[in-house]
Protein backbone atom coordinates (compact mmCIF):
# COMPACT_ATOMS: atom_id res chain seq x y z
CA UNK A 1 0.00 0.00 0.00
CA UNK A 2 2.81 2.46 0.77
CA UNK A 3 4.17 2.54 -2.82
CA UNK A 4 0.67 3.37 -4.12
CA UNK A 5 0.32 6.23 -1.63
CA UNK A 6 3.76 7.57 -2.53
CA UNK A 7 2.90 7.42 -6.23
CA UNK A 8 -0.31 9.36 -5.53
CA UNK A 9 1.57 12.16 -3.75
CA UNK A 10 4.26 12.23 -6.43
CA UNK A 11 1.68 12.53 -9.22
CA UNK A 12 -0.29 15.17 -7.31
CA UNK A 13 2.84 17.23 -6.60
CA UNK A 14 4.06 16.81 -10.17
CA UNK A 15 0.70 18.05 -11.50
CA UNK A 16 0.68 21.02 -9.12
CA UNK A 17 4.24 21.95 -10.06
CA UNK A 18 3.46 21.79 -13.79
CA UNK A 19 0.25 23.78 -13.35
CA UNK A 20 1.88 26.58 -11.38
CA UNK A 21 5.54 26.67 -12.41
CA UNK A 22 5.16 29.92 -14.38
CA UNK A 23 3.04 31.60 -11.72
CA UNK A 24 4.72 34.76 -10.47
CA UNK A 25 3.07 34.29 -7.07
CA UNK A 26 5.25 31.29 -6.28
CA UNK A 27 8.48 31.87 -4.34
CA UNK A 28 11.07 33.80 -6.31
CA UNK A 29 13.94 32.85 -4.01
CA UNK A 30 15.32 29.44 -3.16
CA UNK A 31 18.30 27.94 -1.37
CA UNK A 32 20.34 25.14 -2.89
CA UNK A 33 23.71 23.91 -1.75
CA UNK A 34 26.67 24.42 -4.10
CA UNK A 35 28.78 22.15 -1.92
CA UNK A 36 28.19 20.12 1.20
CA UNK A 37 31.94 19.68 1.63
CA UNK A 38 34.00 21.67 4.08
CA UNK A 39 37.71 21.66 4.77
CA UNK A 40 37.24 22.66 8.40
CA UNK A 41 36.36 20.56 11.42
CA UNK A 42 34.60 23.07 13.67
CA UNK A 43 33.59 21.70 17.06
CA UNK A 44 30.17 23.38 16.99
CA UNK A 45 29.19 22.14 13.51
CA UNK A 46 26.85 19.15 13.45
CA UNK A 47 27.98 18.33 9.90
CA UNK A 48 31.35 17.20 11.24
CA UNK A 49 29.73 14.04 12.59
CA UNK A 50 29.63 12.67 9.02
CA UNK A 51 26.88 10.07 9.46
CA UNK A 52 27.45 8.71 5.96
CA UNK A 53 31.15 8.02 6.50
CA UNK A 54 31.98 9.63 3.17
CA UNK A 55 34.95 11.68 4.31
CA UNK A 56 36.27 13.14 7.54
CA UNK A 57 34.02 16.06 8.42
CA UNK A 58 31.49 17.28 5.88
CA UNK A 59 31.61 15.73 2.49
CA UNK A 60 28.57 14.50 0.64
CA UNK A 61 29.33 16.26 -2.62
CA UNK A 62 29.13 19.21 -4.94
CA UNK A 63 26.31 20.57 -7.05
CA UNK A 64 26.97 19.66 -10.68
CA UNK A 65 26.71 22.43 -13.25
CA UNK A 66 24.39 20.30 -15.38
CA UNK A 67 21.99 19.92 -12.43
CA UNK A 68 22.15 23.64 -11.67
CA UNK A 69 21.47 24.51 -15.32
CA UNK A 70 18.48 22.17 -15.46
CA UNK A 71 17.12 23.58 -12.19
CA UNK A 72 17.45 27.17 -13.45
CA UNK A 73 15.99 26.39 -16.87
CA UNK A 74 12.94 24.63 -15.40
CA UNK A 75 12.12 27.31 -12.82
CA UNK A 76 11.63 31.04 -12.62
CA UNK A 77 13.65 32.37 -9.69
CA UNK A 78 14.96 35.89 -9.18
CA UNK A 79 17.63 34.88 -6.69
CA UNK A 80 19.25 31.74 -5.38
CA UNK A 81 21.17 31.30 -2.16
CA UNK A 82 23.88 28.75 -2.89
CA UNK A 83 25.25 28.26 0.61
CA UNK A 84 24.04 26.06 3.40
CA UNK A 85 26.47 23.91 5.40
CA UNK A 86 29.41 23.39 3.05
CA UNK A 87 32.05 25.72 1.62
CA UNK A 88 30.86 26.85 -1.83
CA UNK A 89 34.39 27.59 -3.05
CA UNK A 90 35.26 23.88 -2.92
CA UNK A 91 32.91 23.22 -5.86
CA UNK A 92 35.11 22.87 -8.98
CA UNK A 93 32.19 23.99 -11.20
CA UNK A 94 31.35 27.11 -9.20
CA UNK A 95 32.66 29.53 -11.84
CA UNK A 96 30.32 28.02 -14.47
CA UNK A 97 27.42 28.16 -12.00
CA UNK A 98 28.06 31.84 -11.23
CA UNK A 99 28.39 32.73 -14.91
CA UNK A 100 25.22 30.88 -15.93
CA UNK A 101 23.15 32.54 -13.21
CA UNK A 102 24.46 35.94 -14.34
CA UNK A 103 23.54 35.18 -17.96
CA UNK A 104 20.02 34.22 -16.85
CA UNK A 105 19.60 37.36 -14.73
CA UNK A 106 19.54 35.47 -11.44
CA UNK A 107 21.20 36.95 -8.37
CA UNK A 108 23.32 34.48 -6.43
CA UNK A 109 24.26 35.03 -2.82
CA UNK A 110 25.76 33.14 0.11
CA UNK A 111 23.76 34.25 3.12
CA UNK A 112 24.50 31.18 5.20
CA UNK A 113 28.20 31.91 5.18
CA UNK A 114 31.50 30.99 3.61
CA UNK A 115 34.80 30.56 5.42
CA UNK A 116 37.15 31.95 2.72
CA UNK A 117 39.94 29.54 3.67
CA UNK A 118 40.08 28.52 0.01
CA UNK A 119 39.33 31.12 -2.68
CA UNK A 120 41.13 30.67 -6.00
CA UNK A 121 41.88 33.87 -7.93
CA UNK A 122 39.70 32.81 -10.88
CA UNK A 123 36.70 32.43 -8.57
CA UNK A 124 37.37 35.79 -6.89
CA UNK A 125 37.47 37.38 -10.36
CA UNK A 126 34.24 35.59 -11.36
CA UNK A 127 32.49 36.91 -8.23
CA UNK A 128 33.20 40.46 -9.42
CA UNK A 129 32.79 39.90 -13.17
CA UNK A 130 29.43 38.13 -12.84
CA UNK A 131 28.16 40.41 -10.04
CA UNK A 132 27.76 37.86 -7.25
CA UNK A 133 25.21 39.33 -4.86
CA UNK A 134 26.52 39.13 -1.31
CA UNK A 135 28.06 36.72 1.14
CA UNK A 136 28.34 36.34 4.87
CA UNK A 137 31.76 35.25 6.09
CA UNK A 138 31.93 32.80 8.97
CA UNK A 139 34.85 32.79 11.38
CA UNK A 140 35.57 29.21 12.40
CA UNK A 141 36.78 29.94 15.93
CA UNK A 142 38.44 32.34 18.30
CA UNK A 143 41.39 30.02 18.84
CA UNK A 144 42.77 26.70 17.56
CA UNK A 145 40.84 24.90 20.30
CA UNK A 146 37.47 26.44 19.40
What are these regions (language model features)?
Residues 2-135, 145-146:
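Conserved alpha-helical substructure of the radical SAM core
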Amino acid sequence: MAPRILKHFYMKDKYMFEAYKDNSELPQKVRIEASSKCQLDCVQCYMRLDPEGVEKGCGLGNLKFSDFKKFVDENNFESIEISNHGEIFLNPELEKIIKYAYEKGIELYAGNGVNLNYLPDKIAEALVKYKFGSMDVSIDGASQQT
